């Protein structure tokens, strides 16, 4: 479900699909329903890898209902290029430019497909070097993460995603290659 984000406050569902699009549906829609909004086009900078089989390598999308924002993890233009975190107004549609873009060598957007947004406004996502990085939702440009968890160094296994537990102030990092879930107490981001 990391390719789908539900926004219970605004009663919407966001779905990232191949062909570099974000579809927005009414949460209560059923049947063959057209999306209420589509975010797509070259100005959006939304890029997923080429679709070859199945759904391709579609990256996650998350809604921040507190700040009325949408965060999309995008890939570089070419294979191996660093990725980006694209921050849009939640209601953006069409070929809309992001409000802010976090990308570049210092930003180090990297592996681990999932992203999360904490209630305090921190984006938690995969970072370079087998780590999890934490950026402020107001960051823009080639901004290094405020904090980094060096998961690979600490556990010996790579990053496959991220989940957060706001109640216990923890970050969970699963790893398929080690069949493990590592848990980190991280009160600073909650």
Describe the role of every protein-language-model region.
Residues 1-8, 42-65, 75-77, 105-122, ...:
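Beta-rich, blade/repeat-based domains predominating
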Residues 21-23, 79-80, 85, 131-133, ...:
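Structural signal for beta-propeller blades
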Residues 33-43, 96-104, 143-151:
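Beta-propeller fold detector
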Residues 9, 18-19, 66, 81, ...:
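Short loop/turn segments that connect beta-strands within the blades of beta-propeller domains
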Residues 160-190:
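Blade-level signature of beta-propeller repeat domains, shared across WD40, Kelch, NHL, RCC1
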Residues 12-15, 69-71, 122-125, 170-173:
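Conserved beta-propeller blade signature
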